[in-house]
Amino acid sequence: MSDPAYAIQVALVGRLVALATEAGQRVYDDVPSEEQRTSDTGEAWPYISLGNGQMVPVDEECFDRSSTYIDVNVWSRDIGFPQVKRIAGAIRAALHEKELAIAGHVLDRMRVENIAYSRDPDGVTRRARLELLVETQPAI
């Protein structure tokens, strides 16, 4: 079985950057410091980060399939939740039941399973966490 997680991440980053949301080019796996984000892009907030994930093999007799879960997080310091909700909505519209070219794999289905909104313990930062399910099989 070929683990599609990295190929999915590469494809997702490309799609998220191309969306041109309020987060702009600030799409990260390993989030740089606030100072570095500002230096690189002119602003530190909002940004998108790829978070926790899990790959579950789906062993079938006739083919090899995977269900990959990945969290896509939206972070904002705007007052209230409007900004994270706008960005999360744009992400859902771009990913839910849409096509995505994943190197070495065939996409069977991609779904945003849920979106959770929360206030960070610092009392200032807002977060939207989208749980994405990507079902794939190796390209033959």
For the regions a protein language model found, what residue spans apply to each?
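Short beta-turn/strand-loop junction motif enriched in small, turn-promoting residues
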Residues: M55-V58, R77, Y117-S118
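Oligomerization/assembly interface segments of phage tail-like spikes and tubes
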Residues: D64-D78, R126-Q137
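Mid-chain, well-packed structural core segment of small domains
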Residues: S76-E97
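Short, solvent-exposed beta-strand/turn "edge" segments of beta-rich domains on protein surfaces
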Residues: D59-R65, D120-T125
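Conserved acidic
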Residues: P4, I8, Q83, V124
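Acidic-leaning, charged glycine-interspersed low-complexity segments
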Residues: A18, E22, A93-I140
